[in-house]
Amino acid sequence: MAADAPEAMAELTYPLGTEDDLRETAKLVGALGRRCLPLTLDVRDSAAVGAAIKQTVTDMGSLDIVVANAGIVSTGELVDVSDVVWQQLVDTNLTGAFHTLRAAIPVMRQQRFGRIVVTSSMGGRMGIPELAAYNATKWGVIGLAKSAALEVAKDGITINVICPTTVQTPMVQPTGSDDIPDDLVRRMMRANPIPQPWLQPEDVSRAVLYLVTDPGVITGSVLEIGLGGSARMH
């Protein structure tokens, strides 16, 4: 997503938890002739999120676009979800988005401009077996974003949500392997009306770019990127 952003914007702050990804992304962005401020950040830490926002404004001069994209997933039946796993999901997926919006909105209000995109999931739009805990956080993210969008609608700020289905990233690969099992590919293809097993990262990037380059008439909306899954929803 960060590598696609320079096509539409000049400067970028990229907070992520892994040093290797930070270096690689900064290199890709730099090759396009754009500035990138790479930061390590744990969105569960409210003070760290606030400091990252402050550093962005100091180094870049403004905070025009924020994408709250941090997230984790855990699968299993609800009765098998431990308190620890539940709290990890809530702290990262929901509280992390809350920390991000709460820190970004005052800066954008002062500017009278801002574009915020929050990543939910198709799991935030429907029930899915063995994803109850994860889906609860993603439903919550939508409620958070929609309510906040109403609070800032008169301030030149838009807040929208994207709901991608599964994206081909390391998150869907078995630990310690670069290969994705054939049976998983077949199962995912059967699940989607459009016969693809999953999205590519750039599919999600294009949706984000559409929302952040909007002139200001779209807010509180949910954009589903579901390979046809939206057609099955009531």
Language-model-detected regions and their locations in the chain:
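Active-site helix of classical SDR
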Residues: 101, 137, 145
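Short-chain dehydrogenase/reductase
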Residues: 1-60, 74
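Short C-terminal tail/terminal secondary-structure segment
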Residues: 126, 208-209, 216-234
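Substrate-binding pocket helix/loop in short-chain dehydrogenase/reductase
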Residues: 77-78, 85-90
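Residue(s) in the substrate-gating loop at a strand-loop-helix junction
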Residues: 121
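Alpha-helical segment proximal to the catalytic Tyr-Lys
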Residues: 106, 150-151
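Short, small/polar-rich loop/turn modules that mediate ligand/substrate recognition or access, typified
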Residues: 153, 158, 218-221
